[in-house]
Amino acid sequence: MFDVIVIGGGHAGVEASAAAARMGKKTLLLTTLIEQIGAASCNPAIGGLAKGHLVKELDAMGGLMGEITDEAGIQFRILNESKGVAVQGSRAQIDMDKYRIIARNKLLKLPNLEISQEQASVLIVENDEVKGVKTNLENTYFAKKVILTTGTFLNGLIHVGENKLQAGRVGELASVNLGNYLQTLGLKMGRLKTGTCPRVDAKSIDFSVLEIQDGDVNPKAFSFRSKNFNPTQLPCYIARTNTTTHEIIKNNFYRAPLFTGQIEGVGPRYCPSIEDKINRFSDKESHHLFIEPQTIDATEYYINGFSTSLPYEVQIQMLRSVKGFEDAKITRFGYAIEYDYIEPTELKHTLELKKIKNLYCAGQINGTTGYEEAAAQGFMAGINASLSIDMKEPLILRRDEAYIGVLIDDLVVKGTKEPYRMFTSRAEFRLLLREENAILRLGKYGYDLGLLSEQDFTYIQNIANNLQKGLEFLLSKEFTPNNQNNAFLESLGEDKISSIVNLQKIVARASFDIEKLKKLDPMFETMDNYSLREILNEAKYYHYISMQKAQVEKMKNLSELKIPENFDFKSVSGLSNEVVEKLNHHKPPTIFAASQISGITPAALDILQIYIKMQKKKA
């Protein structure tokens, strides 16, 4: 008897099984190929805009993705560095082979975790409660909780031109039996589609005509736990399609599964195939292609931006029309893949299914796309399954606390009909949710769960104390426009002042940096750079942050008004049938969650709020 069974060893499965095992739960990970645990099926990169936030948040609570990325990374960059800190994003190119080896070894070394190379075929469900799993090897395993992290494997169908192949990934069997079984449970399900790009033999690329894209000179680690971070970095390159490339693609639209009706699943809006781009943006004469090394040996390159399901011979023809790729040899062809997913409105915020007790879902099965989105969900599913076994309150992150909270709330409340990916624009309180303050926002959760060490948490507390002291000093210290103070400002290269201001207003200037901050008071000279960066950020955006915090307080009032789990919305007089139907379907846990449901009017919220408050007074 296991406490937790995790089905699938991708990024969601890695985090789910690791979290459960590290929280002391006897855990079993079932995966089709142990060699492919933590495999990066698509591009060789972790992070990016908003995705980097997810990785930092995972790391802040004790997740694995940040540490593995730092160990396997071969190029590190901060995207949007010229823009505000709220929308900057960390991104790393990874050695794909090294990444999965590290992930696999981390799991194999964990106490409480067993791994078995088997494919789950059927779930054991009794009275709408999952009890265990049967596998293709006819083994039966019982567990208190089961977490589905099946990725693209549920009835996975690969498309290349007119050819179709049942697979979860090239060379790996699709999960047909489990996919068909889930259809019998009365869950709302659908089909989605994603795709991948060709990989090219490095020897066949003329790099001399490509634009070089180097990593940052002073790269920053993803994990706050990474020590002596000094990675070997490789360049990426930029190529461009041209009108010849576009003509080749247009002339073969009739062979594209995307346009022939062969593919039924909805693809990712923000990561379209090259044929979709040429069709949708027919006026553009060129599209960027990012040429990314797959490993530190750089023997193969991933052609990012060239995702396609066109026939093999067309892929060769269109790639060779690109400058620098005239003699290109494709080692692995691009393809599209369709797969089953469960509509995420079927889930609670804990990622447990509403209809099947003790059954959790994470990753692409919930309609998301991306390694980082999957890892975040897997981590939270592993935590909440473990907390439920211990009969403890679940960990549900609010939208103002974490991008992970935004991700899960969007899925559960709004649902999705297309592959969902995270953007900074999805977060209402993004100034509060910066990458660098993730440890300050979420570190205590990781520590309380036993996923962060005492040493890690002490480090976080020191930064929090420095931030509090530094900000209080800047807000309380007045600067008068006398000769001495103005001479000091001039020595820093700053403009003089003509009226009394506090130091926060001076530090908020765009030209004010860490070196200048250190000269304001000896206290700052003793602080580490992490603390100083956060003091600087908080000072620069102080008024905007204060406004967002005021908005959060309003939201918290609605979030704290909980709706009983089995609440009958029909019992509330004054609600329309449409509103009752939507509320009964979504089963929002709070008034705030109800406010996020499309079609729920302010008047309906007022009625519901008054009714629940009255019921609580009676109780």
Swiss-Prot record:
It holds the Pfam family GIDA_C_1st. It is found in: Cytoplasm. PROSITE patterns: GIDA_1 (PS01280), GIDA_2 (PS01281). GO terms for molecular function: flavin adenine dinucleotide binding. Gene3D superfamilies: FAD/NAD(P)-binding domain, GidA associated domain, C-terminal subdomain, tRNA uridine 5-carboxymethylaminomethyl modification enzyme MnmG/GidA. Keywords: Cytoplasm, FAD, Flavoprotein, NAD, tRNA processing. GO terms for cellular component: cytosol. It comes from the Bacteria. One of its GO terms (biological process) is tRNA wobble uridine modification. NAD(+) binds at residues 267-281. Its cofactor is FAD. FAD binds at residues 8-13. NAD-binding protein involved in the addition of a carboxymethylaminomethyl (cmnm) group at the wobble position (U34) of certain tRNAs, forming tRNA-cmnm(5)s(2)U34. HAMAP family: MnmG_GidA. Belongs to the MnmG family. NCBIfam families: mnmG_gidA. Homodimer. Heterotetramer of two MnmE and two MnmG subunits. This is tRNA uridine 5-carboxymethylaminomethyl modification enzyme MnmG. The lineage of its organism: Bacteria, Pseudomonadati, Campylobacterota, Epsilonproteobacteria, Campylobacterales. The gene is mnmG.
